[in-house]
Amino acid sequence: MSGWPRIYYKLLNLPLSILVKSKSIPADPAPELGLDTSRPIMYVLPYNSKADLLTLRAQCLAHDLPDPLEPLEIDGTLLPRYVFIHGGPRVFTYYTPKEESIKLFHDYLDLHRSNPNLDVQMVPVSVMFGRAPGREKGEVNPPLRMLNGVQKFFAVLWLGRDSFVRFSPSVSLRRMADEHGTDKTIAQKLARVARMHFARQRLAAVGPRLPARQDLFNKLLASRAIAKAVEDEARSKKISHEKAQQNAIALMEEIAANFSYEMIRLTDRILGFTWNRLYQGINVHNAERVRQLAHDGHELVYVPCHRSHMDYLLLSYVLYHQGLVPPHIAAGINLNFWPAGPIFRRLGAFFIRRTFKGNKLYSTVFREYLGELFSRGYSVEYFVEGGRSRTGRLLDPKTGTLSMTIQAMLRGGTRPITLIPIYIGYEHVMEVGTYAKELRGATKEKESLPQMLRGLSKLRNLGQGYVNFGEPMPLMTYLNQHVPDWRESIDPIEAVRPAWLTPTVNNIAADLMVRINNAGAANAMNLCCTALLASRQRSLTREQLTEQLNCYLDLMRNVPYSTDSTVPSASASELIDHALQMNKFEVEKDTIGDIIILPREQAVLMTYYRNNIAHMLVLPSLMAAIVTQHRHISRDVLMEHVNVLYPMLKAELFLRWDRDELPDVIDALANEMQRQGLITLQDDELHINPVHSRTLQLLAAGARETLQRYAITFWLLSANPSINRGTLEKESRTVAQRLSVLHGINAPEFFDKAVFSSLVLTLRDEGYISDSGDAEPAETMKVYQLLAELITSDVRLTIESATQGEG
């Protein structure tokens, strides 16, 4: 490029460099999209805009990608490095309007015909200034919105700092030429496909147009389901039809979101400023699979785990910066207080009561509203656990909203609904102190403005945040596989509850929890907490802590929990340095070196972070506990022991493996433990290696409290086979609380009601107890004896004497 075009672009770039601060999606295009910068690259843009082209250029230069303004020289032929699909106002005729884009595609394809070694990467790129979807009654935007010069000027002026450059996966022109030829019809088809691609991409980033709120309410009121519910309300409460209708509108006002793009923009500014000061980084993994689903037209339902009130904001912020539409979020009615309620509503929150029981009108209005969101194509987010986890482990799922999601499919909608499980992890959860108090019996404090301000005032260094997108679950595919005749239940008017709905929803919910855990994120805090809590004195020398972290890291890297889980790339020493900056640990220095201590008052709180990744280490911990106790054991006997205990662990921690997969996993873990020198393998026997016995013992301690809990329940069951399930849960908790006090067990979940409730249900499912409550004493005693070998003698005596004392 030379002469006037160069001067023109330099002059145009002056105001743009000040006004435009764009973000690249993905954040690092070359590695994330597999672009090979050693091969020729050309860019395809949706329409002729110099502002777009220069915005793209800035991102290309920032990410070491070829400059789009520099022509591409191939076999002595100079070709522009970019193509505009649509024409537009032009200053220089050198650059291609729409008619010439086909000719340019053809020129590129033609070069591939004459040069068999050539392979140009065609990268579609869309540049967006602002992402307001507009309102339904407004002017309809075309799928590719081309602005004239004046419109573009104001768009850049007002939205320059809310601009995104979206790079798509490249298309190999070599493959196109080989598979489809190089004539002009292929070039025309390429241009047509590119236009469709950009239209879809815009919809995925901006979302469908928003309805006027009153129009939405009128449409809901006109639906047959709500009309019938209003009649029933008037009849059952002996009120007029108008009054019943007003009740329905009041419920809609209570429930419905009031989405505002301007509020999204403002909050994005505030959150961007806040995150940069509070978080040292937000790590996002597997977002490309979600972008692809949105691009393919899927109705997305985000199903994250629930750690903190921060989840709502963090996930919407991350999705917005990944080029996706922030979802409509199901939020607890407890958050509908001033000023948070109105703000959350404008950010897409719709509010849900804790229970629907006894209010048919409410349940009908909520179900119809949710169905309307799906039918209009809005993405939705809800927390399948129902509330925030107080222990750091996943809670048993609540299936009400999930059931309504499937009922929405049974209305006969055409868009495929896909559930996206999401693991959210933090190095600091601001409510963790409150959680510990609640687990100790304190009453939950009601959410309010003063409480919110107190929470915000405590925000300091929050370390790193993690958002890992798990394996998507397309509902249509799932139902086709598990309920082949599900389409027979489709009813476009009435909400239906076929016999298969409840068991199917329960299975989907359990599968979602497994997929959330599959996307777990290990980090500096949860790894250091796991190691220090494994030590009886909650302290280790820096060398010991480094060695223990290396053990965990090697296990997770060499035998990954799943393909979706993430492990830090930093060294153990770097992770310790980072964790120490979080001010949770104390360091005592002596002449020999540093001792890292987890203070007693922090120990209870730090169990929360350990529990975030308990599922990723529990199997190697159990193996280590068995080997440590037996000193040497054959693979077959080890496998038998693991097989007995695994169903309880699987149900409690939502582990991913089926029983028939265990032998391969245990073999892989045993080989890795041998490689680390924790054990030796001789004649198919695992032997403890005295040189690294401390590391093995600390690894084993990760399963210690879980095994103690199981021992309590199996001992009670053996001592009193006819005990009913409710009493078994209650007495298990009582003994666990006693054990906690006598043996200094700091984990609040050790005597958590939900944990024992889940365990007793698993015992029923596994046949240890029947529905009538009777247990088989020989079987339960056999399991207790296995567990008794894996816990210390003083703990065993406390368990056995506690029940004898009650007798």
Curated annotation (Swiss-Prot):
Positions of short motif HXXXXD motif = 306-311
Q: Which Pfam families match?
A: Acyltransferase, GPAT_C
A single Gene Ontology CC term: plasma membrane
Q: Which SMART domains does the entry mention?
A: PlsC
Q: Which reaction does it catalyse?
A: sn-glycerol 3-phosphate + an acyl-CoA = a 1-acyl-sn-glycero-3-phosphate + CoA
Q: In which pathway does it act?
A: Phospholipid metabolism; CDP-diacylglycerol biosynthesis; CDP-diacylglycerol from sn-glycerol 3-phosphate: step 1/3
Entry keyword set: Acyltransferase, Cell inner membrane, Cell membrane, Lipid biosynthesis, Lipid metabolism, Membrane, Phospholipid biosynthesis, Phospholipid metabolism, Transferase
Q: State the InterPro entries in the record.
A: GPAT/DHAPAT, GPAT/DHAPAT_C, GPAT/DHAPAT_LPLAT, GPAT_PlsB, Plipid/glycerol_acylTrfase
Q: Provide the membrane topology annotation.
A: Peripheral membrane protein
* Chief site of localization: membrane
Q: Does the entry feature the keyword Iron, yes or no?
A: no
Q: Name one GO molecular function term.
A: glycerol-3-phosphate O-acyltransferase activity
Gene Ontology biological process terms, A to Z: CDP-diacylglycerol biosynthetic process; fatty acid metabolic process
Q: What is its EC number?
A: 2.3.1.15
Family membership, please give it: Belongs to the GPAT/DAPAT family.
Stored PANTHER family:
DIHYDROXYACETONE PHOSPHATE ACYLTRANSFERASE, GLYCEROL-3-PHOSPHATE ACYLTRANSFERASE
Tell me the domain comment.
The HXXXXD motif is essential for acyltransferase activity and may constitute the binding site for the phosphate moiety of the glycerol-3-phosphate.
Annotated protein name in UniProt: Glycerol-3-phosphate acyltransferase
Gene that encodes it: plsB
